[in-house]
Amino acid sequence: MYTYYIGVGSNLGDREGYLVFAVEQLVCTDSVRSVDHSSWIETPPWGPVEQGPFLNGIIKVVASIEPVAMLETILHIECLAGRQREIHWGPRTLDLDIVWIEDEKGHCVRVEESTLVVPHPYFWDRRFVLEPLEEVYPNFSYEGVSISKRLKTLHGLEVY
């Protein structure tokens, strides 16, 4: 059994509708035991592409599915939502990223595959990931630093 923390975002169309769709699809997945999510927050886009604001959050999923299979599941959900990968860091109907995984004992599960790297390589530098993560996992820490302390460090260092 694994606990997945999945970043979710949308900046096209019915943004909230796409985020809710992702939650609903995960709830209906056979290997999933429970699904919870943070509140949604509006954030400016991250990266070099000019585009509209995002609605972001974190989905917490407890499931028996292995990490690469979970990646396949969320890629399928993105596809069902009409996600098109035309521009790197470009606008999207739905973006799902596995940010963090823990095993049944609460230990970090690290993955280094050609298609999946966990912990997500940029998660610790993105307030739009850390703020909703703190909501669903307030005691989270990484490399000995609490999420609240990290957020204080990031405050003012990045646009968002």
Cite the ranges covered by each PLM segment.
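Solvent-exposed residues in well-ordered beta-strands and their adjoining turns
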Residues: G9, V62-S64
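Flexible, gly/pro- and Lys/Arg-enriched active-site loops
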Residues: S38, W46-F54, I65-E72, H76-Y160
